[in-house]
Amino acid sequence: MGYTENLIDFIGKSTDCYHAVKTAKDRLDENGFTELFEGDKWDVQSGGKYYVIRNSSSIIAFEMPKKDFGAFMICASHTDSPSFKLKPDFEINADGCIKLSVEGYGGMIMSSWLDRPLSISGRIVTAKDGKVETKLVNIDRDLLVIPSLAIHMSRDINKGYEFNIRRDMCPIASDKNGRIEDIIAENVGVYKEEILGFDLSLYNRMRGTVLGTDGEYFSAPRIDDLQCMYSTLEGFLNSESDDNVTVFAAFDNEEVGSGTKQGAKSSFLRDVLERICNNSETYKRAVAKSFMLSCDNAHAVHPNFADKSDGTNRVYMNGGIVIKYNANQRYTTDAVSEAVVKYVCKNAGVPYQMYANRSDIPGGSTLGNLSNEKVSLNTADIGLAQLAMHSSYETAGSRDTEYMVKMIKEFYKTEIVL
């Protein structure tokens, strides 16, 4: 299969942040990486390949060079996507149906969740003999739907509508009480009374597909940011460096500000890098010579809403690596890091394009500037161009994933003197 087909498969397995980490973990295991645990003593060896997971939803992998290293070459993306999360007491008996009480996670296009097959995935937690155990859940079948209100009862719906999650976005699940809890418990082989906690989300069941007259586009759920997560992981697994530690990182909770123990604003990255170095002096010297790519997708020019993009800094699907710029440093790219990215792209034979928001339409921030609060190093914000960001079904360019993989491979082997 090609990169796009493999990406679609990766997305299909990564129904939430926990399954995204599990999918990455499986790829790392296949490639001979060893899992380390934060509560254990580490014995990191030259030439070794390792990964660390925090909260089951963030992951950092690294490969040591066979000799003393000079710096860290880091690529970071995120594992989470906007969705609806189940509330602790989620079943509502309403007029012959059981519907589920949900809360919005991240900023989503709510209408894109209507009238399509949905299901539930995430994790549940049990405890036995004082030991907490986490199990992943994926109800791998069409289970739920959030039905629209018929136009006969909402005549002005096409003139614009403000959705209310509590009223409009509760999925219907059954005509019997308690069945969803039973199905979740059966999925992981426990009694529902054993479930002491859960983090469960809805996900769109529609599989990704290639489209366009020549297959130049593809659509899928969670392209933001699994396209970058997949591309950076594949680039990492197919790269090597003689002089630097190569690092792959994927953080949770980017969509809600990253301010969690497993988010980009946490100590996770710093903790891992410090333990690789063993002492403060080595760590500080290495970080001073290091470089990070913060990888998160960007808004392509929308052909139906072209005026929403900047007049000159416009990016297009299949146009290659997007270098993201913001005067207020919501993106970390500056003249130095921009030059590094362009240099790497040219060496990789990969096209690049410059992105800035329209000056009167502010965009969102991403990982780089937040991660820099804990690990201050030269960073550029990059991504790939896509449409319908934060829809439950997004669209991107079929050629761009390969561009990103090639660029990341080149980045990891590049010696950057700053």
Where does each model-flagged region fall?
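N-terminal hydrophobic/helix-forming segments and targeting peptides
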Residues: 1-418
